[in-house]
Amino acid sequence: MKDTEKYLIHANIAADGVVERSDVVGAVFGQTEGLLGDELDLRDLQESSRVGRIDVAVESENGQSFGEVTVASSLDKVETAILAAALETIDRIGPCHASVEVTSIEDVRAAKRREVVERAKELVAGGFEETSLASDDILDEVREAARVEGIVDYEGLPAGPRVGDSDAVIVVEGRADVLTLLECGIKNAVAVEGTNVPDAVADLTADRTVTAFLDGDRGGELILRELAQVGDVDYVAFAPPGESVEDLDRNTVFEALRGKVPYSSLADEPNLREAATDDSGSAPIDNEGRGRSGEMSEPSESETESERASDGGDDGDAGVVAGGARSATDRGLVDAVEDTPAPAATDAGEVDEVGEDREGDMESDSDTADINDAEFDDRAADDPNLDEAADAESVEETDAPLDNEPRSIEEHVQEIVDAGSDRARLLGDDRGVLAEIDAVDAFDAIEDAETAPHTVVVDGLIDQRLLDVAAQRGVSELLGREVGEFVKRPVGTRVLTVGDLRTGS
C-alpha cells in the first residue's frame, strides 16, 4: 500500500472511558460496515489494497482515552472525502461513548513533492562535484600528466627518457628531483633513491659524463661521497644551501647547473658544498681572458703590451659576450645537459709549424723593408717632412697585433664577419688564434683540433651540427653571422650572433 497511497486521513478520537487499540479498530470497521454500500465498504477496500492499514495511537488519562487514527487511501479525492466523513459517524468505541473528528486529509504526493524540492535544494547547494576547471587548472593537470608519463624505469630506478642513450647523465637524489628536471626540459636525470647508491647507477657512471646534482644539505653531501666511492663523478652541482632540488624553479636549476665544478677539485675538501660554491664563482670567463677552470696562462711581454693597448675595448666586449650569452642560453630548449671538458694540452708540432710560417714571413718582410729603406733615404734628402711621417708609420706598424696575438672578441668579429671573409677562426682561452679556415670547414676543424678552442667565430650560419660538435669539444662560445633553429641547445656552449654581441641582448 505504501507504493500506491495518495492520501492520508488524520482523525482525532476521544472516549469516555479506557479503551485500547483493538477497540478503536473494531469500531471503525463495525460502525462503517454497510454505511456506504458495497463499493465503499472499508473491509472490501482494504482487501483490494485501495485502503491501507489503519494506524491507531491511543492513551488513557483520568478515566478518559485520547488518540489519533490514520487511514491511507488510494481512492480519488471525492471517495477519500466520503470515507473520511464516514469515520465521523462513529459514536461508540467498545462500551464507551466516543467522538471522532477528521483534522486533515494529507495529499501524500504533495508531501513527496515537498521532500523532492527540499532534497533538490540540498543537492544543488553541495551535491554536485566541481566539474568546471579554469584554464590554468587544465594546463597544470595536463603538464602534470606529461611529467609523470615522461619518467621511465631504468634498472628499477626513476629516470628521464634520455638516460639510456645520452652520453651525459645527471644523478639526483629522488623521483621528485627527476620530475623537477623533466619540467625544465632536462631528460637525462636518474635518481639514486637514498644514500645507498645502486649498482645500476655505479655502472652507468663508468662510461658517461656524470654530473651529480644534489640537495644543499648534509644528505646531499653524503650521497656525493658514496657516489664517488662506487662510481665516477665528473662534475658536481648543489642546490642553494638548505634547499632541495625538487623545490627549485627553472631559473635556479639552470643557474646551479651552470655553476657546476669538476669533482676532482673537491675530492679532498672537508666540506664539499662550501668548496663547490666557492669554485663555481670563478667558473665563468672573466674580463682578463681566464678559462672555465679559473687558471690563466702567463702572457709574454709583447702580449702584455698589446693587452694594455686594448684594455678598454676588451673589457666591454667581454661583458657583452657574457650577458648576451646568458640570455641566449636561457631562450633555448634544453634536451640534455652535456658539457665535455676541453683537452688542455697543446701540440708542439702545431706550434713549430706556426713558428716556421711566421719566420718565413718575417724574412720576406725584412727584404722588402731593406729596399723601401733605400728608396726612403733618397727621398728624405729632398723632403725633411718624410722623416716625421715615417716615424708615425713605424709606430702604427709596431702597435698592430700579430695574427696569433690575443685581442678582443670585437676585433676578431670585425676581421672575420664584418669583412665578409667566408672564414672561421678558432680562438684559445686567451683569445689568441689557434687556426683560421674556410667557414664551410669549421665543423671538421673543431672536430679535429688538437687543442679544443675556447671560442669560435664564423662568417656564416651556426646550425645544429656545428653546435653539437662544439659542445662535444667543450667550446664555450660560438659567434656567427646568424643562428639557425636548434632542436637541443647544450648548456655549456653559448651561441650568439654578431648582433646579439653588440646589443648585449
From Swiss-Prot:
GO cellular-component terms in the record? cytoplasm; DNA-directed RNA polymerase complex; exosome (RNase complex); primosome complex
Signal peptide (from-to): none
Which GO biological-process labels does this protein carry?
DNA replication, synthesis of primer
Query: Spans of biased composition, class Acidic residues?
Result: 349-376, 384-402
Any idea which UniProt keywords this protein has?
DNA replication, DNA-directed RNA polymerase, Magnesium, Metal-binding, Nucleotidyltransferase, Primosome, Transcription, Transferase
Under Pfam families, the record lists: Toprim_4 (PF13662)
Q: Which residues bind Mg(2+) 2?
A: D215, D217
Q: Name one GO molecular function term.
A: metal ion binding
Domain of life the protein comes from:
Archaea
The residues listed in the UniProt record as binding Mg(2+) 1, with positions renumbered to this chain, are: E173, D215
Low complexity bias (residue ranges) = 318-327
Region Disordered: start-end pairs: 268-410
Cofactor note from UniProt?
Answer: Binds two Mg(2+) per subunit.
The Toprim domain sits at 167-241
The EC number(s) this enzyme carries: 2.7.7.101
Which Gene3D superfamilies does the UniProt entry name for this protein? Answer: 3.40.1360.10
- Give the record's family classification: Belongs to the archaeal DnaG primase family.
Q: What is the protein's quaternary organization?
A: Forms a ternary complex with MCM helicase and DNA.
This protein is called DNA primase DnaG
- What species was this sequence derived from? Halorubrum lacusprofundi (strain ATCC 49239 / DSM 5036 / JCM 8891 / ACAM 34)
Report the gene name: dnaG
